[in-house]
């Protein structure tokens, strides 16, 4: 029987309330804490950023996932790239990514960020932000709905929970 994302949290809460304590591996606790305390930094470049703002509004309530939008890359661990990435903007994207705290994740939002979108054949457009930074989750759509973004964030939370240990690339640590 497979459990959904929220059923796992419910089972965890039941175990703590029944026993008063929890037996687990440190990797599971760290993964759970990281997944439920994402601090995203927005990199809104086009119309997808409007949908991202809508997802952060009270109707969708992204705060329930433990997310707190941060204005600085040094305070964030998730970058949401939303919109058309141009060749002139690509070095800035990489610079901001390099300034983020480790561990860090990237969510690519919309057709333009995923693969160039409508402007794919333009000389000035990067054909996907994954050519500049490593991307963990792709959210399709033009523009993607707020529900699609929230689903992508839930997929990222599942991925973070599966990550174990403190294995970091030496190039990521400053």
UniProtKB/Swiss-Prot annotation:
Which InterPro entries does the UniProt entry name for this protein? Answer: NADH_UbQ_OxRdtase-like_20kDa (IPR006137), NADH_UQ_OxRdtase_20Kd_su (IPR006138)
Q: Could you tell me the keywords of this UniProt record?
A: 4Fe-4S, Cell inner membrane, Cell membrane, Iron, Iron-sulfur, Membrane, Metal-binding, NAD, Quinone, Translocase, Transport, Ubiquinone
Which free-text remark accompanies the cofactor?
A: Binds 1 [4Fe-4S] cluster.
What biological-process terms (Gene Ontology) are attached? Answer: aerobic respiration; electron transport coupled proton transport
The GO terms describing molecular function are: 4 iron, 4 sulfur cluster binding; iron ion binding; NADH dehydrogenase (ubiquinone) activity; NADH:ubiquinone reductase (non-electrogenic) activity; quinone binding
Cited Gene3D superfamilies = 3.40.50.12280
| Topology in membrane | Peripheral membrane protein
Q: Which SUPFAM superfamilies match?
A: HydA/Nqo6-like
PROSITE patterns per record? COMPLEX1_20K
What's its catalytic activity?
a quinone + NADH + 5 H(+)(in) = a quinol + NAD(+) + 4 H(+)(out)
What are the record's GO terms for cellular component?
A: plasma membrane; respiratory chain complex I
Q: What is its main location?
A: membrane
Q: How does it assemble?
A: NDH-1 is composed of 14 different subunits. Subunits NuoB, C, D, E, F, and G constitute the peripheral sector of the complex.
Q: What is this protein called?
A: NADH-quinone oxidoreductase subunit B
């Amino acid at each position: 029987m497979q459990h959904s994302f929220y059923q796992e949290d419910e089972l965890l809460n039941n175990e703590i309330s029944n026993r008063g304590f929890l037996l687990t591996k440190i990797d599971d606790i760290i993964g759970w804490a990281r997944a439920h305390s994402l601090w995203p930094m927005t990199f809104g470049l086009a119309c997808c950023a409007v949908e991202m703002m809508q997802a952060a509004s009270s109707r969708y309530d992204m705060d329930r996932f433990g997310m707190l939008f941060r204005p600085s890359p040094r305070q964030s661990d998730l970058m949401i790239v939303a919109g058309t990435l141009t060749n002139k903007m690509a070095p800035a994207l990489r610079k901001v990514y390099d300034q983020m705290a480790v561990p860090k994740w990237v969510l690519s939002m919309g057709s333009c960020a995923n693969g160039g979108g409508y402007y794919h054949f333009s000389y000035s457009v990067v054909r996907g932000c994954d050519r500049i930074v490593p991307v963990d989750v792709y959210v399709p759509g033009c523009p993607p709905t707020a529900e699609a973004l929230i689903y992508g964030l839930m997929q990222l939370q599942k991925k973070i929970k599966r990550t174990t240990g403190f294995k970091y690339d030496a190039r990521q640590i400053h």
